[in-house]
């Protein structure tokens, strides 16, 4: 809808079945506790299959062996993914040692998976180990509450290892926002931590009895780094500093990347600027955005339920005015800010507090002991001696943060001895994939297992055209839900079918433009043929400092997406 002719504030019609499930769940309890004791199946049944997502878990199975098990008349090998709540990605070394042990002892795959939402996931948790994982997390001060489904997910915060004071302030706000928007139900504590049930009725003053219409994602961003890809998120607080001290935030609302193949009512969208707010209004504004989306978001069609669609339906000014009314403020004009990068600075960086920070490249975020590269063991050994913390980045890498000069050599030796500091190309540093096969039930094509060898081939193309040190921001996502953030890449691959992808071009290096579909449903060899041709032109015709995405737009290879609600599919 246009701003002159906005649509209805509330979408009338038959509610989706997810709304029925939430209403009947007794504040997210369902019959999960009873289901845990059912040894006849390795999975959760009925509504519980979806309700466990509010508790930070997804039920999955190993798709590599699904057909084999079906032929043997066996149910799929059900196992859970658990995603930790870890605002800003900061984790202590004590916590790291605990999660390392659990991954080794109690998961099928034995790995820790860093995600591009600054947390970690366990894959392959059998039903018998589901309660123990929650209790292990609780024992070290962690939880998995609200890391999935219709809530405010893990809050991101720029991993700035240099501006230590600014990072500390922004990180505290990320934690405060996360805590403020958490569900108040006691279901999590009752089911997983055996806390006693009390007679009083639960209340959800912010989220409501049926929670949000859809997932909701929040970031705290410290320019000039856009490492957290703010335009993938519903609500973004862009830090504004004076003399190195945080004074307030610019608010941007309504970003989101997920689409559905062929559904032209869906589109990726960048976030819209609302205005500037002083620090003291941060929580009130966060709550106002969330409750406006709670009340106005589409509960009849989950494909059109995210904040980006609400904003387009009611109009930006209407949504903004309602946030101002609920928060009791008037936004000031946006303060100046700019982004100059979004990758991680791999290697050592000295902070202004004179501590050192070592950013380690972790390909696809998968921490495991590989032949000749025992990454998992190396990080465990570092965790045993490091006095600071670890920080997970939104690029699926890991920072060994706050290393004193006296410990630097020792930690570097451990990192080098375990293959954690092997040289990597600029192209590999700027490539990312979601998990996809074999564990993700939504996967249509390979992503994490596909990317390393595909990157090799792209590197060879860059070398062939005389630009081996250049890079393309490249993302692969196994389905159009977009976890790999391909819709903010210069070259984005979106899984369509096994071995086939839609190719999107025309994003930029800063992550501020949505790429457009260039070719549909093509194979790896066809993709590489296109990349070879395009990189050849880029190498010869580019202007000084011009990135691949900007070149494809300027050269007329692809039209830029200017207004996604209207021109994303053109």
From Swiss-Prot:
Its EC number(s): 1.8.1.2
Transmembrane domains' residue ranges: none
Keyword Nuclease in annotation: no
Binding site for siroheme: 483
Alphabetic keyword roster: 4Fe-4S, Amino-acid biosynthesis, Cysteine biosynthesis, Heme, Iron, Iron-sulfur, Metal-binding, NADP, Oxidoreductase
InterPro entries the record matches: CysI (IPR011786), NiRdtase/SiRdtase_haem-b_fer (IPR005117), Nit/Sulf_reduc_fer-like_dom_sf (IPR036136), NO2/SO3_Rdtase_4Fe4S_dom (IPR006067), NO2/SO3_Rdtase_4Fe4S_prot (IPR045169), NO2/SO3_Rdtase_4Fe4S_sf (IPR045854), NO2/SO3_Rdtase_FeS/sirohaem_BS (IPR006066)
Cofactor note: Binds 1 siroheme per subunit.
GO molecular function: 4 iron, 4 sulfur cluster binding; heme binding; metal ion binding; NADP binding; sulfite reductase (ferredoxin) activity; sulfite reductase (NADPH) activity
Catalytic activity from the UniProt record: hydrogen sulfide + 3 NADP(+) + 3 H2O = sulfite + 3 NADPH + 4 H(+)
Gene3D superfamilies: Sulfite Reductase Hemoprotein, domain 1
Gene Ontology annotations of biological process type: cysteine biosynthetic process; hydrogen sulfide biosynthetic process; sulfate assimilation
Pathway: Sulfur metabolism; hydrogen sulfide biosynthesis; hydrogen sulfide from sulfite (NADPH route): step 1/1
Cofactor(s) the protein needs: siroheme; [4Fe-4S] cluster
Enzyme class: oxidoreductase
A family per Pfam: NIR_SIR_ferr
Record-listed [4Fe-4S] cluster binding positions: 434, 440, 479, 483
Entry GO terms, CC: sulfite reductase complex (NADPH)
Family as reported in the entry's similarity comment: Belongs to the nitrite and sulfite reductase 4Fe-4S domain family.
Described purpose of this protein according to its UniProt entry: Component of the sulfite reductase complex that catalyzes the 6-electron reduction of sulfite to sulfide. This is one of several activities required for the biosynthesis of L-cysteine from sulfate.
Subunit structure and binding partners: Alpha(8)-beta(8). The alpha component is a flavoprotein, the beta component is a hemoprotein.
Protein name as annotated: Sulfite reductase [NADPH] hemoprotein beta-component
Species for this entry: Salmonella paratyphi B (strain ATCC BAA-1250 / SPB7)
């Amino acid at each position: 809808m246009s701003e002159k002719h906005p649509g209805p504030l509330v979408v009338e019609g038959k509610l989706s079945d997810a709304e029925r499930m939430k209403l009947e769940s007794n504040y997210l309890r369902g019959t999960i506790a009873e289901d845990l004791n059912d040894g006849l199946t390795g999975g959760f049944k009925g509504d519980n299959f979806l309700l466990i997502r509010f508790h930070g878990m997804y039920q999955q199975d190993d798709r590599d062996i699904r057909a084999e098990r079906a032929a043997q008349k066996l149910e799929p090998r059900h196992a859970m993914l658990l995603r930790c709540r870890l605002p800003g990605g900061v984790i202590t070394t004590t916590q790291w040692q605990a999660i390392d042990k659990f991954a080794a002892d109690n998961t099928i795959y034995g790995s820790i998976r860093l995600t591009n939402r600054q947390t970690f996931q366990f894959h392959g948790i059998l039903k018998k180990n589901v309660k123990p994982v929650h209790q292990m997390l609780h024992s070290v001060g962690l939880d998995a509450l609200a890391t999935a489904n219709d809530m405010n997910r893990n809050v991101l915060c720029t991993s700035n290892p240099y501006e230590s004071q600014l990072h500390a302030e922004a990180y505290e706000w990320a934690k405060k926002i996360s805590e403020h928007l958490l569900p108040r139900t006691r279901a999590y504590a009752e089911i997983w931590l055996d806390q006693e049930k009390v007679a009083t009725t639960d209340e959800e003053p912010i989220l409501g009895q049926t929670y949000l219409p859809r997932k909701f994602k929040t970031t705290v961003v410290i320019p000039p780094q856009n490492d957290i890809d703010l335009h993938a998120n519903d609500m973004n607080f862009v830090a504004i500093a004076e003399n190195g001290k945080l004074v307030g935030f610019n608010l941007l609302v309504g970003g989101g990347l997920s689409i559905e193949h062929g559904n032209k009512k869906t589109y990726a969208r960048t976030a819209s600027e609302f205005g500037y707010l002083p620090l003291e209004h941060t929580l009130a504004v966060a709550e106002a955005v969330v409750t406006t989306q709670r009340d106005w978001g589409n509960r009849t069609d989950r494909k059109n339920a995210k904040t980006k669609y609400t904003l387009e339906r009611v109009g930006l000014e209407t949504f903004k005015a309602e946030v101002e009314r609920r928060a009791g403020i008037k936004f000031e004009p946006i303060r100046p800010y700019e982004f100059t990068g979004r990758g991680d600075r791999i290697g050592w960086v000295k902070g202004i507090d004179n501590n050192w920070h070592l950013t380690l490249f972790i390909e696809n975020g998968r921490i495991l002991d590989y032949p000749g590269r025992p990454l998992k063991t190396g990080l465990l050994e570092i965790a045993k001696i490091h006095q600071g913390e670890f920080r997970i980045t939104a690029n699926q890498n890991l920072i060994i943060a706050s290393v004193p000069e006296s410990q630097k050599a020792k930690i570097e030796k451990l990192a080098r001895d375990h293959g954690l500091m092997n040289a990597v190309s600029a192209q590999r540093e700027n490539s990312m994939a979601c998990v996809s096969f074999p564990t993700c039930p939504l996967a249509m094509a390979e992503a994490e297992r596909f990317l390393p060898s595909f990157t090799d081939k792209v590197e060879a193309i860059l070398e062939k055209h005389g630009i081996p040190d250049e890079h393309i921001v490249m993302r692969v996502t196994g389905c159009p839900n977009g976890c790999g953030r391909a819709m903010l890449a210069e070259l984005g691959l979106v899984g369509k079918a096994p071995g086939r992808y839609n190719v999107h071009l025309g994003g930029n290096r800063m992550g501020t433009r949505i790429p457009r579909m260039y070719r549909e449903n093509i194979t790896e060899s066809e993709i590489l043929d296109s990349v070879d041709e395009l990189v050849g032109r880029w190498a010869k015709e580019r202007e000084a400092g011009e990135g691949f995405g900007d070149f494809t737009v300027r050269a007329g290879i692809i039209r830029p997406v200017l207004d996604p609600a209207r021109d994303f599919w053109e």
